[in-house]
Amino acid sequence: MNINVTLIGQMGTFLVFWWFVNKVIWPMFANIATERQRKIADGLNMADKAKFAVQEAEHQSQEILSKAKMQAAEIVSRANKEASEMIAQAKEQAQRSSEAEVLQAHVQIEQEKRQVRDELRAQLSHLVIAGAEKVLGREVNDRDHERLLHELTEKF
């Protein structure tokens, strides 16, 4: 056998093999590789979109959290203000109540002073009349009694 014929036979076999691989097997692998590239690209795009969505969600959650903090601070502020107003109203009401009680006590004291004064005047006038009866040695009639009482009350 001649090496040229063998070489030509091997070249022919190689060409048939090359043609078969190019027409049948290579397109399958090319399709598989292309499909994988497409899936990988889609996965990367989805990962980028998911990353952006996560960043957006974090941003929104921060905004919501800051709004919630502001609302909570506002609610606490309003509650403190209402509590202060309630305390002020309670103090004012207590002040008015105590002033009214003090005024009522003053009025009651004045009434008691007048009553005691009137009782003392009556007792004093009876003592004076009794003393005058002893000094005069006679009983004082109603007209004299009224006149003496009137004079004594004017002096007091």
UniProtKB/Swiss-Prot annotation:
Q: Which domain of life is it from?
A: Bacteria
Q: Which UniProt keywords apply?
A: ATP synthesis, Cell inner membrane, Cell membrane, CF(0), Hydrogen ion transport, Ion transport, Membrane, Transmembrane, Transmembrane helix, Transport
Q: Which residues form the signal peptide?
A: none
Question: Where in or outside the cell is it found?
Answer: Cell inner membrane
Membrane topology value: Single-pass membrane protein
The GO molecular function terms of this record are: proton-transporting ATP synthase activity, rotational mechanism; proton-transporting ATPase activity, rotational mechanism
The reply to whether Transport figures as a keyword in the UniProt entry is yes
Query: Which cysteines does the record link by disulfide bonds?
Result: none
Q: What does this protein do?
A: F(1)F(0) ATP synthase produces ATP from ADP in the presence of a proton or sodium gradient. F-type ATPases consist of two structural domains, F(1) containing the extramembraneous catalytic core and F(0) containing the membrane proton channel, linked together by a central stalk and a peripheral stalk. During catalysis, ATP synthesis in the catalytic domain of F(1) is coupled via a rotary mechanism of the central stalk subunits to proton translocation. Component of the F(0) channel, it forms part of the peripheral stalk, linking F(1) to F(0).
The cellular component terms of Gene Ontology attached to this UniProt record, alphabetical and capped at eight, are: plasma membrane; proton-transporting ATP synthase complex
- TM segment ranges: 7-29
Could you identify this protein by its name?
ATP synthase subunit b
Does the keyword field hold Nucleotide-binding? no
Q: Which Gene3D superfamilies match?
A: 6.10.250.1580
What subunit structure does UniProt give? F-type ATPases have 2 components, F(1) - the catalytic core - and F(0) - the membrane proton channel. F(1) has five subunits: alpha(3), beta(3), gamma(1), delta(1), epsilon(1). F(0) has three main subunits: a(1), b(2) and c(10-14). The alpha and beta chains form an alternating ring which encloses part of the gamma chain. F(1) is attached to F(0) by a central stalk formed by the gamma and epsilon chains, while a peripheral stalk is formed by the delta and b chains.
Protein family per UniProt:
Belongs to the ATPase B chain family.
